[in-house]
Regions:
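Conserved ABC ATPase "signature" region
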Residues: 71, 117-137
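Conserved ABC ATPase signature
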Residues: 142-147, 151
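ABC ATPase NBD Q-loop/coupling interface
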Residues: 66-81, 141, 232
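ABC ATPase "signature
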Residues: 226-227
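Short helical segment in ABC ATPase nucleotide-binding domains corresponding to the A-loop/adjacent helical element
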Residues: 48, 101-110, 120, 141
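Catalytic Walker B motif of ABC-type/P-loop ATPase nucleotide-binding domains
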Residues: 168-171
């Protein structure tokens, strides 16, 4: 029995007539961090958005092939339930224009989960999980938009955790952060993979090498190579992968 929580089979995606993803096939292991790397425009963020159907919001999209979460086709899952199970954190922190506490209980309210006491306990537990409880426990009524960029991003991750996802999608979560804040978010990812499965899109190859267990290199809509991160970075099997990670292009 395998431990794959997410699989793609012959996945293709078109923006109008533009073929953005081409026959993508790979498996994601449970409780792992999988990094998607490649030059701008290669399709890695488009692929990430497929996994919780965020691309459905874009006009003139056409897809073929299959995506499975726990062997269930995502098209057969209620989209609200899918986005509860497969949560996403975006490139720039996007807290809601509420208080810190309002952000933390928003998902619970939307999904009708828990009474007032349970919501408060869940908010505390998830803030603790991302290392923010001590910093924010006396600031729960503070507008979330007043926080620093790093704290906003960690708050967005904590907010996602309240609805107990299985898979966390991170689309360049550190691109707006300084090196110290980036290090903290990377440490958080390493802690979270004990309980969750994480996919991250990153332009930072050093970050991919530091935090991920598996790496996929994408180029012009193709998944050129996928494997264990140590193998991808030390002995890639495709010369295009080697060219990218050694800086010959990208």
């Amino acid at each position: 029995m395998n431990d794959f929580v997410l699989k793609t089979r012959d996945l293709n995606l078109y923006y109008g007539t533009f073929h953005a993803l081409k026959n993508i096939n790979f498996n994601v292991h449970k409780n792992s961090i999988t990094a998607l790397i490649g030059p701008s425009g290669c399709g890695k963020s488009t692929l990430l958005r497929c996994f919780n159907r965020m691309n459905d919001l874009i006009d003139d999209i056409r897809m073929s092939g299959d995506i499975f979460v726990h062997d269930q086709r995502i098209e057969d899952v209620d989209i609200i339930e899918l986005r509860k199970k497969v949560g996403m954190v975006f490139q720039r922190p996007n807290p809601f224009p509420f208080t810190v506490y309002g952000n933390m209980v928003y998902g619970l309210k939307i999904h009708g989960l828990g009474n007032k006491k349970k919501k408060r306990n869940m908010a505390e537990n998830c803030l603790r999980a991302v290392g923010l409880w001590e910093e924010l426990k006396d600031k729960l009524s503070t507008p979330a938009l007043d926080l620093s960029e790093e704290i906003k991003q960690r708050l967005c991750i904590a907010r996602l955790l309240t609805v107990e996802p299985e898979i966390i999608l991170l689309d360049e979560p550190c691109s707006a952060l300084d090196p110290i804040a980036t290090m903290r978010v990377e440490e958080l990812m390493m802690e979270l993979k004990q309980k969750y499965t994480i996919l991250i899109v990153t332009h930072n190859m050093q970050q991919a090498a530091r935090v991920s267990d598996y790496t996929g290199f994408m180029l012009l809509g193709d998944l050129v190579e996928f494997g264990e991160t140590s193998q991808i970075f030390t002995s890639p099997s495709d010369e295009r992968t080697e060219g990218y990670i050694t800086g010959r292009f990208g």
